Amino acid sequence: AAEQRRVLPSLGRAPQAVINGNEAIGLGLARGGLEAFIAYPMTPVTGLLHFMAHYAEDFGFTVVQPESELAVMLMSLGMAYAGRRAAVCTSGGGFCLMTEGFSLSGAAELPVTVVLGQRPGPSTGLPTYTSQSELHFALHAGQGEFPRLIVAPATPLEAYEWSPAVLGLSWKYQVPGVILVDKTLCEGSFSTDAGEAMSLPVYEVAAWDGASPYKRYARTDTGVSPLAFPPLPGEAVKVDSYEHDEAGLTTEDAAETVAMQEKRLGKLVQLEHEIELLPAVKVTGPAEATTALLCWGSNGPVCEE
């Protein structure tokens, strides 16, 4: 039989990778030095768990699927206590179960990176559709006040860029970070040139200088306490979900409580300065336009078009 073929014209550029948002996040986290990935499968980020498990040996990190989202969050905080950079992924319902642990991250100043894939709620909602309904949830998740970092990439390239930034900043400032995505980005495939990714600074972690006794929550000018990890001969590395003093011992003293709350919230100033150094906002279109369209996440390219 005759065979008819159509030759497509060359685009005049180098070939690009075709990847989805989940894969881009995974590659970005690996780029940022991830050491452990913990998750319980939930649409639309199940593909991320599969991707990380498939390439765990190649990238040299640990992948664990425990029994629930509660275990996911607490296991990641335990790894952070031991000095391992961990990330988790979930969707809205799973993040509901994680919120107490998310607040523990804020109180104990244990870094964790959460990939939160949005889908329509409430409750189970429409698990195979896309949504952008959980920005306020991420901003206010967890009891009490504590700093957190949230980014909402619009494309796989931005997901690849910002995932290591969240991981690094979360560790530098010892705060929880959220990569807020949705089904459209997570499971949509895009032509992507990773060579266009922004370069990131090296986010140094404040290390303990060896002065005894070790104070896990030592108050500093930046609010960031020096980190040390067990086992530490002759020293105790104590973290606490209760309000605590510099050594990590539980306290109900009013002055100490105020000082610790101000210490934690004081990190926001430094964190905001770090974000200002990065291209966190993308502006397109004519500069003389009288109307601006503000958008975030996967709606960005749609609005831009």
Please state what every model-predicted region is.
Residues 47, 122-123, 158-159, 186-189:
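Short, well-ordered, mixed-charge alpha-helical segments that flank or form enzyme active sites
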Residues 2-141, 147, 152-153:
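Thiamine diphosphate
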Residues 36-40, 81, 160, 167-169, ...:
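Broad hydrophobic/π-residue packing in well-ordered secondary structure
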Residues 3-32, 167-305:
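Flexible, low-complexity linker and terminal segments
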